[in-house]
């Protein structure tokens, strides 16, 4: 298996991975929380007063709550592919008082069960990297936005986990790290989907670990371990983990191992006027 097929994401595998991670997710999702916070800060640069907001990939509901607080006059819908994530979100103490303004729906980010032009803001933090068809996903998101609605998203760029990818390449021929898209490719896809005025920037972030096992454990706890079709089957044995640890040692500095993340932040707008027929044809 090679080429694009090697990196084909299996939606059922993605769902299972995040379902398993749901109960421990908040304790391990350090990077996810930080990225979401920084993405939310970008809303301060806009003057949108939304009536309806969609939080795609809401996970355990943390960003949904923050959006509710930011927009007290808005209705919020949180969507996630993993049912267990939504179970955790629905049990949050903060959720009960806000049930009239918020709801959670289990659905795929690329095939959402809502009418076109339903939302003023679509918020999606660290979701796009799990969507197999970028063009179809962005077209779906644009379909859901009202004229001049705002898309606000973050995702991961190709330098994410570059140390882990390089270390695994010395151990075997399997793909162990998901492929991440370049910022410019995402920008081109936004234009193809009919969005206007896309703005993106990149930020490099680094998490520090004592050893490779800690890194692998964290990735599993947040559901972000490899789910591509080209991954090696079976358990990652002690011998292979030992070889991985040895290969990773070249990056050790001051007794610690880095795990690099390239975070892409983006905003884009739905056109002020969009004929209904064009939404279905994917035209601008």
Task: Write out the residue ranges for each language-model feature.
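N-terminal, positively charged/glycine-rich alpha-helical extensions of SAM-dependent methyltransferases
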Residues: 1-24
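Conserved alpha-helix/loop element of class I SAM-dependent methyltransferases that forms part
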Residues: 30-51, 66
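C-terminal lobe and adjacent flexible extensions of AdoMet/dcAdoMet transferase-like proteins
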Residues: 216-284
């Amino acid at each position: 298996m090679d080429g694009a097929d090697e990196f084909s994401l299996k939606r059922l595998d993605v769902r299972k991975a995040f379902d398993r991670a749901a109960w421990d997710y908040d304790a391990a999702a350090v990077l996810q929380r930080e990225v979401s916070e920084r993405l939310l800060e970008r809303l301060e640069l806009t003057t949108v007063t939304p009536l309806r907001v969609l939080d795609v990939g809401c996970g355990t509901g943390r960003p949904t709550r923050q959006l509710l607080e930011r927009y007290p006059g808005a209705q919020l819908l949180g969507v996630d592919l993993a049912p267990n994530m939504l179970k955790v979100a629905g049990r949050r103490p903060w959720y009960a008082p806000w049930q009239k303004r918020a709801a959670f729906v289990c659905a795929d980010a690329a095939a959402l069960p809502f009418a076109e032009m339903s939302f003023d803001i679509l918020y999606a933090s660290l979701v796009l990297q799990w969507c197999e068809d970028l063009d179809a996903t962005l077209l779906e998101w644009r379909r859901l936005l009202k004229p001049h609605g705002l898309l606000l998203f973050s995702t991961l760029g190709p330098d994410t986990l570059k140390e882990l990818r390089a270390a695994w390449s010395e151990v075997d021929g399997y793909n162990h790290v998901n492929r991440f898209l370049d910022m410019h490719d995402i920008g081109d896809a936004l234009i193809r989907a009919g969005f206007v005025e896309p703005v993106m920037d990149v930020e490099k972030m680094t998490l520090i670990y004592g050893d490779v096992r800690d890194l692998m454990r964290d990735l599993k706890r947040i559901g972000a371990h490899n789910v591509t079709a080209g991954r090696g089957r079976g358990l990652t044995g002690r011998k292979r983990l030992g070889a991985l640890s040895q290969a990773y040692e070249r990056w050790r500095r001051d007794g610690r191992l880095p795990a690099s993340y390239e975070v892409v932040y983006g905003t884009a707008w739905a056109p002020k006027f969009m004929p209904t027929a064009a939404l279905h044809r994917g035209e601008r």
